[in-house]
């Protein structure tokens, strides 16, 4: 397994719409394993393949405190959503920035697991929010797209400053 490079906003590759996975095979399983390693190394709770410049519909999630409840979503499909909620979300592709994003409180999805088996999942709370956030990545959408133009611009300016400081270090 290896840690992959996470793309950072405003990299345009984050806007590429991911393609469906044709077949779950050893290559896809290796990508899943590398994505988990990357997500844990970056201290995230979710990662979409788009964020590591792999434009296939693959998501890995682990919202557990002990980091031992891996969830793999290949070709996820939203079946139902209900209620309204929102928390301050962050994103590995938008470092050190957080914003309140409106989300559905509960979701029901269908996806394939790491072995290519189809399953359905009903989720609420943080898991439901994380699923929605990562599914947005698969269609080229970022959490900042839910914000006003002024807030997006402010985040862009903060990131440019952060990147300049990182380049000097």
Curated annotation (Swiss-Prot):
Key word Iron present: yes
One GO molecular-function entry: peptide deformylase activity
GO terms (BP aspect): co-translational protein modification; translation
Protein keywords: Hydrolase, Iron, Metal-binding, Protein biosynthesis
Reactions this protein catalyses: N-terminal N-formyl-L-methionyl-[peptide] + H2O = N-terminal L-methionyl-[peptide] + formate
Cofactor(s) the protein needs: Fe(2+)
Active site: residue positions: 134
Annotated binding of Fe cation, by residue: 91, 133, 137
Cofactor comment text: Binds 1 Fe(2+) ion.
Alphabetized Pfam families for the sequence: Pep_deformylase
Enzyme Commission designation: 3.5.1.88
Entries under InterPro entries matching the protein: Peptide_deformylase, Peptide_deformylase_sf
Stated family: Belongs to the polypeptide deformylase family.
Role noted for this protein: Removes the formyl group from the N-terminal Met of newly synthesized proteins. Requires at least a dipeptide for an efficient rate of reaction. N-terminal L-methionine is a prerequisite for activity but the enzyme has broad specificity at other positions.
Protein's name according to its UniProt entry: Peptide deformylase
């Amino acid at each position: 397994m290896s840690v992959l490079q996470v793309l950072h906003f405003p990299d345009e590759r984050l806007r590429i719409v991911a393609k469906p996975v044709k077949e779950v095979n050893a290559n896809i399983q290796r990508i899943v394993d590398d994505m988990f390693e990357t997500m844990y190394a970056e201290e995230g709770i979710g990662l979409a393949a788009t964020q590591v410049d792999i434009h296939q519909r693959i998501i890995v999630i682990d919202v557990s405190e002990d980091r031992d409840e891996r969830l793999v979503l290949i070709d996820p499909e939203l079946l139902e959503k209900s209620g309204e909620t929102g928390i301050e979300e962050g994103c590995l592709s938008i470092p050190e920035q957080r914003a309140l994003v409106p989300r559905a409180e509960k979701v029901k999805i269908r996806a394939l697991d790491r072995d290519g088996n189809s399953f359905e999942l009903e989720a609420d709370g943080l898991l439901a929010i994380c699923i929605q956030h990562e599914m947005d990545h698969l269609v080229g959408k970022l959490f900042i797209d839910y914000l006003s133009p002024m807030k997006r611009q402010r985040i862009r300016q903060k990131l440019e400053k952060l990147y300049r400081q990182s380049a000097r270090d």
